[in-house]
């Protein structure tokens, strides 16, 4: 039958990268198929054609009848079955080896980068002894079925299942599941219907049933492995959202921070201080009593409540009303003083004699102040020249 050691060595490596059920399947393949096929089955079918005897002397009739009874030998059919069933495993093994090599190269690159980083860290800060022994020095490979490797594994199981079913169905249509001791043949060049006899029919039937049971067990293991992987994938997909929900930490609402409670460092200012101030008169902070708001400023406040603050620069003057009104009384006072000075200059030459008399009377009244109580009731003093210019009571009406 030849040497099966090459295929056995490859399948042993596939065994390292399979699931538990896949390893059981490989055990069934090795022990109950390859081993039995290489030892016992060859001896049973060794004399198959030589012991096939027909009751005719017609040349070639016996060979034609054997070809009709056994279009392909059982042993060769089972060898083809083993090869076809093992081919998906070989394809998966090639992909797994490629995946493992790529992972090894990636780990080597990461290890090189880690060593370079460790050397840089040692130059900056030397490590304590036994600190960098956390990594696994053995480099043991932890095999995991995930991603493309898992998909390849499932596909190779599906193809194995299809090949198993195909060979079982093919064997049934070729031979059936029993070997009859008598086979009737009427194929040309046989002169008539010829009786042919098969050697060891019972023993061959037992081997056929045994190999059929092994194929059924292999098919069952394939179906169980596919179901196991699919259920495992579904459970992982259902478990992932629950883990994500458990891993999510509920966010606590951030409380508002009062700006006044934050200590401000010297030379820095808080961004919250740039918000618009709630009052408009900075003089109140110094202790000056604020004056009542003018009508224009009331309109300003009403317009603030009506619209957004962005349009204030367009609707109103940029100057605050308080500062604008603080300058207007000063200008009015200066103008009033200038008008009074002009009136005084015009009336000065006309009122000089009267003013002198009034001043003399005032001086005499002051000298006689305690002795003239009757004159205090009625003030007959003439108005000063400044009092004539304005009707308001002024502090400089009396000259001391």
UniProtKB/Swiss-Prot annotation:
Ranges facing Extracellular side: 43-71, 178-205
Family: Belongs to the connexin family. Alpha-type (group II) subfamily.
Role according to the record: Structural component of eye lens gap junctions. Gap junctions are dodecameric channels that connect the cytoplasm of adjoining cells. They are formed by the docking of two hexameric hemichannels, one from each cell membrane. Small molecules and ions diffuse from one cell to a neighboring cell via the central pore.
Topological domain ranges for the Cytoplasmic compartment: 13-21, 93-156, 227-400
One of the GO BP terms on file: gap junction-mediated intercellular transport
Subunit and partners: A hemichannel or connexon is composed of a hexamer of connexins. A functional gap junction is formed by the apposition of two hemichannels. Forms heteromeric channels with GJA3. During early stages of lens development, interacts with the C-terminus of MIP.
PROSITE patterns assigned: CONNEXINS_1 (PS00407), CONNEXINS_2 (PS00408)
Composition bias, Low complexity: 381-392
Pfam families: Connexin, Connexin50
Residue spans that sit within the membrane without traversing it, per the record: 2-12
Bridged cysteine pairs (disulfide): 54-196, 61-190, 65-185
Lineage per the UniProt record: Eukaryota, Metazoa, Chordata, Craniata, Vertebrata
Biased composition (Polar residues): 129-138
Residues annotated as transmembrane: 22-42, 72-92, 157-177, 206-226
Impact after mutating residue 364 to A: Prevents degradation
Gene: GJA8
A Gene Ontology term for the protein's cellular component: connexin complex
Species of origin: Gallus gallus
Annotated InterPro entries: Connexin, Connexin50, Connexin_CCC, Connexin_CS, Connexin_N, Connexin_N_sf
Outcome after substituting residue 368 to D: Increases cleavage by caspase-3
Annotated protein name in UniProt: Gap junction alpha-8 protein
């Amino acid at each position: 039958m030849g040497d099966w050691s090459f295929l056995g060595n490859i399948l042993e490596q596939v065994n390292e990268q399979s699931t538990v059920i896949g390893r059981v399947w490989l055990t069934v393949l090795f022990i109950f198929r390859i081993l039995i096929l290489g030892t016992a089955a060859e001896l049973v079918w060794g004399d198959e054609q030589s012991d096939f005897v027909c009751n005719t002397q017609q040349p070639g009739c016996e060979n034609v009848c054997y070809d009709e009874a056994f279009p392909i030998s059982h042993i060769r059919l089972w060898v083809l079955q083993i090869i076809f069933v093992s081919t998906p495993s070989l394809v998966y093994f090639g992909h797994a080896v490629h995946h493992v090599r790529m992972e090894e190269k990636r780990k080597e690159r990461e290890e090189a980068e880690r060593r370079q980083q460790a050397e840089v860290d040692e130059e900056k800060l030397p490590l304590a002894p036994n600190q960098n022994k956390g990594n696994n020095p053995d480099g043991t490979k932890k095999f995991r079925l995930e991603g493309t490797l898992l998909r390849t594994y499932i596909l190779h199981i599906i193809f194995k299942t299809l090949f198993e079913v195909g060979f079982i169905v093919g064997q049934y249509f070729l031979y059936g599941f029993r070997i009859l001791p008598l086979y009737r043949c009427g194929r040309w060049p046989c002169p008539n219907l010829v009786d042919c006899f098969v050697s060891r029919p019972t023993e061959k039937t037992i081997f056929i049933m045994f190999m059929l049971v092994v194929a059924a067990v292999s098919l069952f293991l394939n179906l169980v492995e596919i179901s196991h992987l699919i259920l495992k994938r579904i459970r992982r997909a259902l478990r992932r959202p629950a883990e994500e929900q458990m891993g999510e930490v509920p966010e606590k609402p951030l409380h508002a921070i009062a700006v006044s409670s934050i200590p401000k460092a010297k030379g820095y200012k808080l961004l919250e201080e740039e918000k618009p101030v709630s009052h408009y008169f900075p003089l109140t902070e110094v202790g000056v009593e604020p004056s009542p708001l003018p009508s224009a400023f009331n309109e300003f406040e009403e317009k603030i409540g009506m619209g957004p603050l962005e349009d204030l620069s367009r609707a109103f003057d940029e100057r605050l009303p308080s500062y604008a009104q603080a300058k207007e009384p000063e200008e009015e006072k200066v103008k009033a003083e200038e008008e009074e000075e002009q009136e005084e200059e015009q009336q000065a030459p006309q009122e000089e004699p009267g003013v002198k008399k009034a001043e003399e009377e005032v001086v005499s009244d002051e000298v006689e102040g305690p002795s003239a109580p009757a004159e205090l009731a009625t003030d007959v003093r003439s108005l000063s020249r400044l009092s004539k210019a304005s009707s308001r009571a002024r502090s400089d009406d009396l000259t001391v």
